[in-house]
């Protein structure tokens, strides 16, 4: 099993890499831009690391993948309020680029989009206790809006091109 993990040097991405690294017969390649939120020392030294923005990834970089797990994102809500452009570039354009490449990988088993519960908006004011795949998206920051846009792009690629995909919307971890 060959897995490409984008954003694999981030807090959650690196935890995933360390967990999946325990699975026998698994080859992992991490792609990370190595921004303020990354730490390459969080992943094992024997796992290949490509320092690259996901907007610049090519088929030559990941065309062998069985699975793509897309953790890469600008994720600081407060930073998105003051400057949304980096969020649009990474979360929307970067995800779009990854999708376009994934569509060209003949044996890709799954494109896993790591999203956020922020796409649902303020659950308290909406008086919703739980969200599921049918809950409407009501993002309230550029961060959550760009993650919702990325989710829609992944879904559209699945419906239009048959891209095998899964979207997870995790909640805040700490």
Regions found by a protein language model. Give the residues of each.
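N-terminal Rossmann-like NAD(P)+-binding domain of SDR-like oxidoreductases, especially those catalyzing
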Residues: 1-173
């Amino acid at each position: 099993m060959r897995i490409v993990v984008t954003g694999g040097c981030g807090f959650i991405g690196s935890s995933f890499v360390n967990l999946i690294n325990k699975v026998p017969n698994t080859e992992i390649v991490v792609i990370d831009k190595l921004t303020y939120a990354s730490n390459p020392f969080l992943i094992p030294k024997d796992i290949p690391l490509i320092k690259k923005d996901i907007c610049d990834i090519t088929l030559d970089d990941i065309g062998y993948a069985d699975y793509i797990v897309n953790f890469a994102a600008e994720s600081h809500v407060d930073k998105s309020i003051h400057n949304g452009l980096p969020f649009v570039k990474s979360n929307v354009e970067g995800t779009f680029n990854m999708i376009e490449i994934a569509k060209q990988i003949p044996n890709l088993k799954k494109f896993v989009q790591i999203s956020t519960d922020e796409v649902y908006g303020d659950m308290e004011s909406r008086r919703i206790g739980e969200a599921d795949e049918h809950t409407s998206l009501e993002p309230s920051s550029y961060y959550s809006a760009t993650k919702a846009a990325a989710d829609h792009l992944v879904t559209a690629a699945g419906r239009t091109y048959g891209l095998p995909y899964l979207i997870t919307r995790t909640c805040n971890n700490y």
